[in-house]
């Protein structure tokens, strides 16, 4: 069964809304791990809208499971990753005007650049995951650049408004997952997953880890982080 990476970006979003010192994402990560999180995920954006450099530095020192650093494939971010050495990096697309990551990374269209970044990071013993749509060409390109992982973008599945569309998107993810595993990639997934839609994705053969943030932090506002994480672990198990 898939494991759970808890994205704590939105703890930082609340903090940055008032430009203050609380709530602290580092404390949130501790509570998430106490609740059963298998990993902690943060996205250090170029505009620093939520997670800050200080957060990543402290999380590297305090996280006891594993730290997944989401970032754009820029020279600045590569330098930060090489300095901090997270347990792995997930390369994601990034636009300043977006509210959240809107789609998968286009590996096909920038294969030389992505290949260069993957090589730099993995030569420093930092495994790389690529956040992509479950399209055959993108999966093939991920193999070519020698990434260790892909993270399948589950946004269209999560946003499906009827059961027929949802099943079509789930089948698309299942096919992509199978293709990737056959090609030697390890497979994670994330984006838009909630307590109510997570199980079918978690149950896909070979699915390793689900990176989930907003729905957990939303639930945590009502019941606390530890309980919110425990409930998501139950949802992943289909309980």
UniProtKB/Swiss-Prot annotation:
Q: Where is this site: Transition state stabilizer?
A: 151
| Pathway assigned to this chain's UniProt record | Cofactor biosynthesis; pyridoxine 5'-phosphate biosynthesis; pyridoxine 5'-phosphate from D-erythrose 4-phosphate: step 5/5
| UniProt binding sites for 1-deoxy-D-xylulose 5-phosphate | 9-10, 45, 50, 100
Q: What does this protein do?
A: Catalyzes the complicated ring closure reaction between the two acyclic compounds 1-deoxy-D-xylulose-5-phosphate (DXP) and 3-amino-2-oxopropyl phosphate (1-amino-acetone-3-phosphate or AAP) to form pyridoxine 5'-phosphate (PNP) and inorganic phosphate.
Q: Which PANTHER family does the record cross-reference, listed alphabetically?
A: PYRIDOXINE 5'-PHOSPHATE SYNTHASE
| EC number annotated for this UniProt entry | 2.6.99.2
Q: What is its main location?
A: cytoplasm
Q: State the reactions this protein catalyses.
A: 3-amino-2-oxopropyl phosphate + 1-deoxy-D-xylulose 5-phosphate = pyridoxine 5'-phosphate + phosphate + 2 H2O + H(+)
Q: Where in the cell is it found?
A: Cytoplasm
Report the enzyme's class at the first EC level: transferase
GO BP term (any one): pyridoxine biosynthetic process
> Which Gene Ontology CC terms are recorded?
cytosol
A GO term, aspect molecular function: pyridoxine 5'-phosphate synthase activity
Which NCBIfam families would you find in this protein's record?
Answer: pdxJ, PRK05265.1-1, PRK05265.1-3, PRK05265.1-5
- Write the protein's name: Pyridoxine 5'-phosphate synthase
Its quaternary organisation is: Homooctamer; tetramer of dimers.
Q: List UniProt keywords, sorted A-Z.
A: Cytoplasm, Pyridoxine biosynthesis, Transferase
Cite the SUPFAM superfamilies for this sequence: Pyridoxine 5'-phosphate synthase
- Work out whether the entry's keyword set contains Transcription regulation: no
Family statement drawn from the similarity comment of this UniProt entry: Belongs to the PNP synthase family.
